[in-house]
Amino acid sequence: MCGIWALFGSDDCLSVQCLSAMKIAHRGPDAFRFENVNGYTNCCFGFHRLAVVDQLFGMQPIRVKKYPYLWLCYNGEIYNHKKLQHHFEFEYQTKVDGEIILHLYDKGGIEQTVCMLDGVFAFILLDTANKKVFLGRDTYGVRPLFKAMTEDGFLAVCSEAKGLVNLKHSMTPFLKVEPFLPGHYEVLDLKPNGKVASVEMVKHHHCRDEPLHALYDGVEKLFPGFEIETVKSNLRILFDNAVKKRLMTDRRIGCLLSGGLDSSLVAATLLKQLKEAQVQYPLQTFAIGMEDSPDLLAARKVANHIGSEHHEVLFNSEEGIQVLDEVIFSLETYDITTVRASVGMYLISKYIRKNTDSVVIFSGEGSDELTQGYIYFHKAPSPEKAEEESERLLRELYLFDVLRADRTTAAHGLELRVPFLDHRFSSYYLSLPPDMRVPKNGIEKHLLRETFEDSNLIPKEILWRPKEAFSDGITSVKNSWFRILQDYIEHQVDDAAMASAAQKFPINTPKTKEGYYYRQIFENHYPGRADWLPHYWMPRWTNATDPSARTLTHYKAAAKA
């Protein structure tokens, strides 16, 4: 995890513009570099480094002697870089995984390059010989990327929007900033004056398609067919490999552990892989909650079962409320469920950075979208409709769960790794018949649970534990985080404000006082940027007016039991 920033065709003093690059310093606490592009006085790169691989020669922009005309600034991890290096016999100058991008580009161009990358990435590649600029982002947008471009060809790119909003440009007093679409790359012409012109935007990978790099990843051969035992075996192989490839780091590895199915499977598989790799330190797992939190109890059971060095972080309602402003600033969104769920993750990331030496943190993000884990999937009218909804959620991950996971950890200089969003694992899961993936017997993620039924990876009671939303599970069933927030915000936003909400906030007008409160904070930090969020996250096929899972029938029944 790092922070990347670049300008092309700036008409303002670069030393002044560079101040904006410091807005993302949290993403790379180990080092910073600002570098002008030779021959283009109005083009530059900024890079904040979190040293995870090749601590000696890993600074960016990456430049190697063989390609003096190529400049690369990227944020990500390319897990198959060594396999590709050996297969194509590339001569590396560094040990940095991102160097593979330069070699692949020289060999086969930009399209082949992005299709070959197994990992998560956001990059800016400059080719001064052919006068081209390329931008690219991974399939699910696990690594963030924002851009701003004016009609006269000024281009600004950054890992987070906050690094662009204060940039100055003579032609545009208000610079439009927007997220770069996941799963795409863009080709731009570089003009002699340093300005650019967009040539094409290309989708390089759909989540359902088996990626091109599968030809080179070395995973043992999968069994053909959709018999249940065959499918379960293939899923175990792919998930095991998804975790194993993500061990690539020179820093200590830890794991978030909520005690839910997803994080528990990740933690248990991770610990097994660390032992096989003969890593000499114990795996640290981390859980957060208030007193009587069901997550804390469940996480403790999993940690005892797998034998991790477990850390429990307690917080109270006041501490959670106090960080709402910081959280919304970090997130760059006012989406209600994203803000709620981010408080716990923000606080536990802060604890990890301050109290441990774990830097690379594994987590279970992406599973709910991929495996139809949300409670409302029980209401899907058909397996085909459930499949459509699952793919929609995956396409929008970069706006919600992936955004939350990246910003809350990056705010504290941590790097997050998400095995459930592995290309091979996710594309195989999505290739399965729709009726195999839906909830069964009143239990969501039935296929995933059944896959690990006989593995003894995690306790049976955890394997079959019902879905618990992170923002709800960190508090007690009787007094959820949802209810705590409502009680507090009721006194912060009056009825008169709600009555005029549509006039004040015409885009995504808040319908609740909680939504209004978050929107006010967002507008204080990012005025006029409401269009970053196309719509609020809400469950489908239900008349719920709030995204909290606790408001759904499934939970109301559980609370009374």
Swiss-Prot record:
The record marks 365 as: Important for beta-aspartyl-AMP intermediate formation. PROSITE patterns: GATASE_TYPE_2. It comes from the Eukaryota. ATP binds at residues 256, 288, 363-364. Pathway: Amino-acid biosynthesis; L-asparagine biosynthesis; L-asparagine from L-aspartate (L-Gln route): step 1/1. GO terms for cellular component: cytosol. Its EC number is 6.3.5.4. GO terms for molecular function: asparagine synthase (glutamine-hydrolyzing) activity; ATP binding. InterPro entries: Asn_synth_AEB, Asn_synthase, Asn_Synthetase, AsnB_N, GATase_2_dom, Ntn_hydrolases_N, Rossmann-like_a/b/a_fold. It catalyses: L-aspartate + L-glutamine + ATP + H2O = L-asparagine + L-glutamate + AMP + diphosphate + H(+). It is an enzyme of class 6 (ligase). Signal peptide: none annotated. SUPFAM superfamilies: Adenine nucleotide alpha hydrolases-like, N-terminal nucleophile aminohydrolases (Ntn hydrolases). Residues 2-191 form the Glutamine amidotransferase type-2 domain. Residues 213-536 form the Asparagine synthetase domain. This is Asparagine synthetase [glutamine-hydrolyzing]. The lineage of its organism: Eukaryota, Metazoa, Chordata, Craniata, Vertebrata. The gene is ASNS.
